[in-house]
Amino acid sequence: MKVRNSLKSLRSRHRDNRLVRRKGRVYVINKVQRRFKARQG
């Protein structure tokens, strides 16, 4: 999992990326290509 300041650019890398908020943290998840997983930090 990548940790990035800005998730907007990471979200645009694949069309199946989803922006999810869990426990006060923002994540990018992708059910199809799981290597696009990222967390904001």
UniProtKB/Swiss-Prot annotation:
Domain of life from the UniProt record: Bacteria
A GO cellular component annotation in the UniProt record: ribonucleoprotein complex
InterPro entries: Ribosomal_bL36, Ribosomal_bL36_sp, Ribosomal_L36_bact
Similarity comment text for this entry: Belongs to the bacterial ribosomal protein bL36 family.
Pfam families membership: Ribosomal_L36
PROSITE patterns given in the database record: RIBOSOMAL_L36
Alphabetic keyword roster: Ribonucleoprotein, Ribosomal protein
A single MF term (Gene Ontology): structural constituent of ribosome
Keyword Ribosomal protein listed: yes
Taxonomic placement: Bacteria, Pseudomonadati, Pseudomonadota, Alphaproteobacteria, Hyphomicrobiales
GO biological process, one term: translation
Protein name in the entry: Large ribosomal subunit protein bL36
